[in-house]
Design a protein with these regions (language model features):
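A conserved active-site cap/scaffold subdomain adjacent to cofactor or substrate pockets
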Residues: 25, 29-32, 38-56, 185
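Conserved phosphate/anionic-ligand binding catalytic regions in large, soluble enzymes, centered on
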Residues: 1-2, 84, 141-148, 228-231, ...
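Catalytic nucleotidyl-transfer cores of nucleotide-processing enzymes
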Residues: 184-186, 192-193, 197-257
């Protein structure tokens, strides 16, 4: 952009050192675009048009545009995920205020520590969610960091609960009212001192229940934009603030005065396109002001020397007048996987990689010739 190229579009092969998942491969194809003099709305509109045309011409499916937009905070509060599957309900409900003074120590201690108590009301699913099935859901919750899973089943035979015996009659009534609980419902409750744990556990439980009970329509294509991601996230491991996406995303102008005083509340001009619970693509408006970039790097703990050493070329480029610019990239393989309604990205890649990033069919990565050592490429150890 600084060099005078107003915009570009590329299909790029990428390799990332990331964990293998059903929708992720270490080597993949990316559809990437960057444009000068655009706003968030411009980027979204262009990519909605691209997706609409692809789905119409390839699948004969008419995708409705513009896509729904949802702030990150709303996505987490309602779905427990920053890439929510909106083809079904089972939305999260915050019952922290109802149970703030609860006699149940698990709830009370979580709230006192600054956390929350939230639940999913699996309406009409008491028949499907037996005690045995709920035990399986406990394991799901623990996998995502929760210490356990509290539940209440309301059936024609009465109410069975793992925790309501610790509540007063008033608290029980208030909880049932807040949750909209009726006969046939199951309340799945998670409490923790960390809201991130509550969201992760309930988000996973929501998907597990939907898959178990057949609540997902496989023929639906539900698109939405998740916007206003936090610029910073705090790393307990490193004891410092880190960039949630990358340090070159432009923060919202109205949040700039909070960068030093309240970094956790700073929102980024970042956006993800989500389809049926999968991130289809993502992007952002980039920083083009050297003063703003300097502030963000300092807030991330970069000394002036380290910032210069790591990003000096970028800071120098800014001095020549970088235009406002932004863009977005799609995962091409993932898009094909979702369009074909496949559960694994391996189904749409000719030679997918295995867990250690090797490819058994061709035996790659292969050994290299000795002469490559002259350009500092060493001979690797075969992964298998």
């Amino acid at each position: 952009m600084v060099g005078g190229i107003e915009r570009y579009y590329q299909i790029a092969r990428c390799f990332r050192d990331e964990d293998l998942r059903a929708d992720r491969q270490p080597e993949f194809t990316q559809i990437d675009m960057e444009m000068s003099f655009v706003t968030e709305d411009d980027v979204m509109a262009m990519n909605e048009g691209l997706v609409k045309r692809v789905f119409r011409e390839v699948l004969g499916v008419d995708v409705e545009t513009p896509f729904r937009r949802m702030p990150y905070s709303e996505a987490m509060a309602r779905y427990g995920s920053d890439k929510p599957d909106t083809r079904f309900g089972l939305e999260l409900q915050d019952v922290t205020d109802v149970l703030r003074e609860s006699g149940f120590a698990v709830f009370k201690s979580a709230v006192e520590a600054g956390g929350s108590v939230r639940l999913i009301n699996a309406k009409g699913l008491a028949g499907a969610l037996t005690r045995k099935e709920i035990d399986k859901l406990v394991d799901v919750a623990k996998t995502y960091g929760a210490k356990g899973l509290a539940y209440t089943r309301l059936t024609a035979d009465g109410v069975t609960s793992s925790f309501e015996k610790f509540l007063s009659e008033e608290e029980k009534a208030a909880l049932h009212k807040a949750a909209g609980a009726e006969t046939g419902d199951v309340l799945l409750v998670v409490a923790d001192a960390k809201n991130s744990t509550v969201f992760a556990a309930l988000g996973a439980l929501r998907l597990a229940v939907a898959n178990k009970c057949g609540l997902i329509d496989p023929d639906k294509f539900n698109f939405l934009w998740v916007t206003d991601f936090p610029f910073f996230e705090y790393s307990e491991e490193e004891g410092r603030w880190m960039a949630m996406h990358h340090p070159f995303t432009m923060p919202r102008a109205e949040d700039l005065d909070k960068v030093e005083s309240d970094p956790g509340s700073v929102r980024a001009l970042a956006y993800d396109m989500v389809l049926n619970g999968c991130e289809l693509g993502g992007g952002s408006i980039r920083i083009n002001d050297p003063a703003v970039q300097d502030r963000m790097l300092k807030a991330l703990g970069f000394s002036e020397e380290r910032a210069r050493e790591s990003f000096g070329f970028l800071m120098d480029a800014y001095q020549y007048g970088a235009p406002p610019h932004g863009g977005m990239a799609f995962g091409f393989d993932r898009m094909v996987m979702l369009m074909l309604k496949r559960d694994s990205i391996r189904d749409v890649i000719a030679f997918p990689k295995v867990q250690n990033a090797g490819e058994p069919m061709s035996g790659c990565p292969e050994t290299v010739e000795e002469k490559l050592s002259l350009i500092h490429i060493s001979e690797p150890t075969r992964p298998y």
